[in-house]
Amino acid sequence: MKEIATEYSFIKYTELELDDNGSIKQLSIPNKYNVIYAIAINDELVYIGKTKNLRKRINYYRTAINRKDKTSDSTKSALIHSALKEGSKVEFYARQCFNLSMTNELGTMTIATIDLEEPLFIKLFNPPWNIQHKKK
């Protein structure tokens, strides 16, 4: 993951840890907005996603394992919890995205790079948890 982070401008955001009760500790770090994020387990990239609010997304992964209605996020939550309980290192990386605005005689158009970058990184790295993008 370190090579990917260096080459593609991902910065380490946080490393998750378990508390004494076996729950993921609450984050107490500044938030990141409009980012592509990567989850790495023992320095291996396992997932690429996008979010408008990274701390909120990670907090959702912290608690989604306990929700009655299962989603793809609860699946990732269970995988993250399992990795931590096995003693693996779970880290989140972030790459800042921007909105590009172009103006011509017809007006202004804005494109969010987050929507362009996420599928490109998924295709480039083919992370195992990105099953929605796997070829059928």
From Swiss-Prot:
Cofactor (UniProt): Mg(2+)
Protein name: Endonuclease II
Lineage: Viruses, Duplodnaviria, Heunggongvirae, Uroviricota, Caudoviricetes
Alphabetically ordered keywords of this record: Bacterial host gene expression shutoff by virus, Degradation of host chromosome by virus, DNA-binding, Endonuclease, Host gene expression shutoff by virus, Host-virus interaction, Hydrolase, Magnesium, Metal-binding, Nuclease
Domain of life from the UniProt record: Viruses
GO MF annotation list: DNA binding; endonuclease activity; metal ion binding
GIY-YIG domain ranges (all copies): 32-131
Main function: Contributes to the degradation of host DNA, permitting the scavenging of host-derived nucleotides for phage DNA synthesis. Sequence-specific endonuclease. Catalyzes nicking of the bottom strand of double-stranded DNA between the first and second base pair to the right of a top-strand CCGC motif. Does not cleave native phage DNA, which contains 5-hydroxymethylcytosine instead of cytosine.
Subunit record text: Homotetramer.
Keyword Signal: no
